[in-house]
């Protein structure tokens, strides 16, 4: 009963005229930041943090501004991912797998509308989980140590091999290339230089923004130039703006399942929306009964990662609010905002400063309603990107990509590396290698290595720690099954057809 009283008080805080305007501004700015390749929610929140403090906003208003920017970025990241095959951030990579083919088929508006609605329900379910189960889930998340996180990364990487049902070997090879890129730089534990080729610029490793923009944006530009130089016409239709009832009904189960999975992954500190979107995409592909349609414009391939992205983003607030542990990189920045206001995140916040906690929860709900109302009418405007002539679109994408990469370290080396990775991406795409496993392998590789090192450090080098706990065992068994079961089933189906052929 107290929960609902506190929630009503939270709505009283969030629905003051000042905070409603702040939430609206945060949603709009977040959508724009999410739309721009390479920025993402961490940079969006980091940019707004000093502004919130400089404007002397109250603590609850500052937190509402940053939270709405965060959620707005999750909405905005899908736009360039679907329409241009240029993910706004790592979490939007999975959306491009089916969203971009839908846009090429003239269903860009359908993809954007289903992603907006799926994102809304993903956030709604996650916010319900925060309200009902926050303290309980915070304790559950503590059961995940380095060994469990290592097993989770292994499971996520194992799932990458199934992205291309026709040729899983190419998916695994692409993921291995991504893992290899993640090892570039100085080893944090030993100080050994790895694959730097005596270049000072590579000592810090390859930045994610450089990788994702090179592999997706630059390679896409090269493909566009190839089509225009060969006299071919790129398929760039707009089509209808909204999904129909049949398509919506098709995505109900997908959205519900992905929201729940995304929420639980988001609760785990450090897991994040990237892992949530990858796991839910592969889950839906396995459950679909027609996995061949995924990657070719299946609407469920858009609904699953989008519901998971937003559910995970909302779920990441649980460890921050209840334990004082950041659930994601973005909530880590938001914790910095709390310290600026002399607020210590943790269990005491729920009793000592309930107006801030419940005001934030209420603002998350209000922000998602605002974003849905804001984004659906703008779909027509967004899809007009598809009608922009290539002579303007190609240099525009190149300029935005170059600015995004140069902003990381302000070095021309990053621009050269971006182009080199773009050429690599172009060659791999011509050889029908998928880019998503490569980029996700790069993202997961760093987390995989960090948690492996931590686990072995705790156990003094004893490898048994990696499979001692029940959670780690379950995840590793699932990873083995994901790798082994599909080829075994294919062999069984092949042998079962042979007698029929012989009999004929």
Where are these regions (language model features)?
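Helix-loop-helix hairpins and the membrane-proximal interhelical loops
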Residues: 1-60, 135, 139-141, 193-298, ...
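Transmembrane alpha-helix interface/packing and boundary motifs in multi-pass membrane proteins
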Residues: 27-41, 72-85, 160-165, 260-269, ...
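Short helix-coil transition sites and intra-membrane helix breaks within transmembrane domains
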Residues: 33-43, 82-93, 125-129, 265-275, ...
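Re-entrant/interfacial helical elements at transmembrane boundaries that shape
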Residues: 41-51, 66, 81-101, 132, ...
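Membrane-interface alpha-helices at helix entry/exit sites of multi-pass transporters
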Residues: 59-64, 101-118, 289-302, 329-332, ...
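A structural-propensity feature for long, helix-poor, extended segments
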Residues: 70-81, 88, 298-323, 327, ...
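Membrane-embedded alpha-helical segments of transport systems
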Residues: 71-76, 117-129, 137, 181, ...
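Membrane-embedded alpha-helical modules
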Residues: 113-230, 340-494
